[in-house]
Amino acid sequence: MFTLKKSLLLLFFLGTISSSLCEQERDSDDEDQGEVTEQVVKRLVRGCWTKSYPPKPCFVRG
């Protein structure tokens, strides 16, 4: 019974650490996605509105 409790405690501890690491990575990925979106929007607006009037449809190339 004592070894079962130790095993369950160890699994809980490792699961908690794994969960927190995944959450941190997910949060950092979300922040990176926001920055990429801002860059694409800035590129899109600058390319469309400054080169011609009336603006032509723009296609963003990654």
UniProtKB/Swiss-Prot annotation:
Mast cell degranulating peptide. Antiproliferative activity against human breast and ovarian tumor cell lines in vitro. Inhibits granulopoiesis in rat in vitro. Causes histamine release from rat peritoneal mast cells in vitro. Has antibacterial activity against Gram-positive bacteria B.megaterium Bm11, S.lentus and M.luteus, and antifungal activity against C.tropicalis, C.guiller-mondii and P.nicotianae spores. Has hemolytic activity. The mature peptide inserts into the hydrophobic core of the bacterial cell membrane and increases permeability without disrupting membrane integrity. It is found in: Secreted. The lineage of its organism: Eukaryota, Metazoa, Chordata, Craniata, Vertebrata. This is Peptide leucine arginine. Belongs to the frog skin active peptide (FSAP) family. Brevinin subfamily. Disulfide bonds join C48-C58. It comes from the Eukaryota. Keywords: Amphibian defense peptide, Antibiotic, Antimicrobial, Cleavage on pair of basic residues, Cytolysis, Disulfide bond, Fungicide, Hemolysis, Inflammatory response, Mast cell degranulation, Secreted, Signal. It comes from Lithobates pipiens. It holds the Pfam family Antimicrobial23. Residues 1-20 form the signal peptide. GO terms for biological process: defense response; defense response to fungus; defense response to Gram-positive bacterium; inflammatory response; killing of cells of another organism; mast cell degranulation. Expressed by the skin glands. Residues 21-41, 62 form a propeptide. GO terms for cellular component: extracellular region.
